[in-house]
Amino acid sequence: MNLNATLFAQMVVFLILAWFTMKFVWPPLINALDERSKKIADGLSAAEKGKAELEAAHKRVDQELAQARNDGQQRVADAEKRAVAVADEIKAQAQAEAARIIAQAKADAEQQVVKARETLRGEVAALAVKGAEQILKREVDQAAHADLLNQLKAEL
């Protein structure tokens, strides 16, 4: 094997190039690769964090929707209860008004019956007196006549 100076010079140049590369070229490349891997890791963690936040936001939205549905159903149920209560109150008022009208009608009818009886008693007493007058063909004393009428009214 013939080793000449060119080969030896090439080896020295190669070693200088290797040392120069390791000293000046390799560290920026390593730093660039490290920064790139750090950016990728940060991006992945940010994506995971965003995904977790999105899931949390979806859960909050679902909870708020469920709460809104429950509130809506509760309001509808309350409105139905109020409607039933108002209907019952109106029904009770109508029944009370009907009972009052019936009681008033009964009282009016009773009053008319009493009035008719009084009128009838007076007419019956007058007819009885007239009949007695015609039978006796004479007029009865006014005081006696009033006493007889009152007595007949009381009996009827």
Swiss-Prot record:
GO cellular component, one term: plasma membrane
Keywords carried by this UniProt record: ATP synthesis, Cell inner membrane, Cell membrane, CF(0), Hydrogen ion transport, Ion transport, Membrane, Transmembrane, Transmembrane helix, Transport
GO molecular function annotations of the record: proton-transporting ATP synthase activity, rotational mechanism; proton-transporting ATPase activity, rotational mechanism
TM region(s), chain numbering: 7-27
Membrane topology: Single-pass membrane protein
InterPro entries in alphabetical order: ATP_synth_B-like_membr_sf (IPR028987), ATP_synth_b/b'su_bac/chlpt (IPR002146), ATP_synth_F0_bsu_bac (IPR005864), ATP_synthase_B_chain (IPR050059)
Pfam families named among the record's database cross-references: ATP-synt_B (PF00430)
Location within or outside the cell: Cell inner membrane
NCBIfam families membership: ATP_synt_b, PRK05759.1-2
Self-association and partners: F-type ATPases have 2 components, F(1) - the catalytic core - and F(0) - the membrane proton channel. F(1) has five subunits: alpha(3), beta(3), gamma(1), delta(1), epsilon(1). F(0) has three main subunits: a(1), b(2) and c(10-14). The alpha and beta chains form an alternating ring which encloses part of the gamma chain. F(1) is attached to F(0) by a central stalk formed by the gamma and epsilon chains, while a peripheral stalk is formed by the delta and b chains.
Assigned protein family: Belongs to the ATPase B chain family.
Function: F(1)F(0) ATP synthase produces ATP from ADP in the presence of a proton or sodium gradient. F-type ATPases consist of two structural domains, F(1) containing the extramembraneous catalytic core and F(0) containing the membrane proton channel, linked together by a central stalk and a peripheral stalk. During catalysis, ATP synthesis in the catalytic domain of F(1) is coupled via a rotary mechanism of the central stalk subunits to proton translocation.
Protein name: ATP synthase subunit b
Source organism: Paraburkholderia xenovorans (strain LB400)
